[in-house]
């Protein structure tokens, strides 16, 4: 326990919380342009081909973002919206592309969990 004199001499320092998505710069989402769309493989126990994109943000930062869902229409120069959220088995991928926003279309034929993949409610046939 410090004395009052010690606290007068030098105040207590606040512990700063480190952000997990620094490229967003305190924004919920950021717009960017795809510079490269490619596939990569995950870390050791898992095996798959994951779709990712290198995105140049409006804040002039370059990040790697994951493309969720089955199938996509993204290519170089596509304008996308990214959000925070890492992919655990892909090192260096800390962002997700939001499906159904800007140039990224929603996942085709998706009926469950539609809001996460930018899919409108299907017309009910009677």
Swiss-Prot record:
Residue intervals passing through the bilayer: none
Pfam families, A to Z: Ribosom_S12_S23
Any GO BP annotation: translation
Similarity field: Belongs to the universal ribosomal protein uS12 family.
Name of the gene encoding the protein in the UniProt record: rps12
SUPFAM superfamilies assigned to the protein according to its UniProt record, in alphabetical order: Nucleic acid-binding proteins
GO molecular function, one term: structural constituent of ribosome
Primary location recorded for the protein, binned into one broad class: plastid
Organism classification: Eukaryota, Sar, Stramenopiles, Ochrophyta, Bacillariophyta
Protein name (Swiss-Prot/TrEMBL): Small ribosomal subunit protein uS12c
UniProt keyword Zinc, yes or no: no
Protein's job: With S4 and S5 plays an important role in translational accuracy. Located at the interface of the 30S and 50S subunits.
Protein biosynthesis recorded as keyword: no
Taxonomic source organism: Trieres chinensis (Marine centric diatom)
């Amino acid at each position: 326990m410090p004395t009052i004199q010690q606290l007068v001499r030098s105040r207590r320092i606040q512990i700063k919380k480190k952000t997990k998505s620094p490229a967003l710069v305190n924004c919920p989402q950021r717009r960017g342009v795809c510079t490269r769309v490619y596939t990569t493989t995950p870390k050791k126990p898992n095996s798959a081909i994951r779709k990712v994109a290198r995105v140049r943000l409006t804040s002039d930062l370059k990040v790697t973002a994951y493309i969720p869902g089955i199938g996509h229409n993204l290519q170089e120069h596509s304008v996308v919206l990214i959000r925070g959220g890492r992919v655990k088995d892909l090192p260096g991928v800390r962002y997700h592309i939001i499906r159904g926003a800007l140039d990224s279309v929603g996942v085709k034929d998706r009926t469950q969990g539609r809001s996460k993949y930018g899919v409108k409610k299907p017309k009910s046939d009677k």
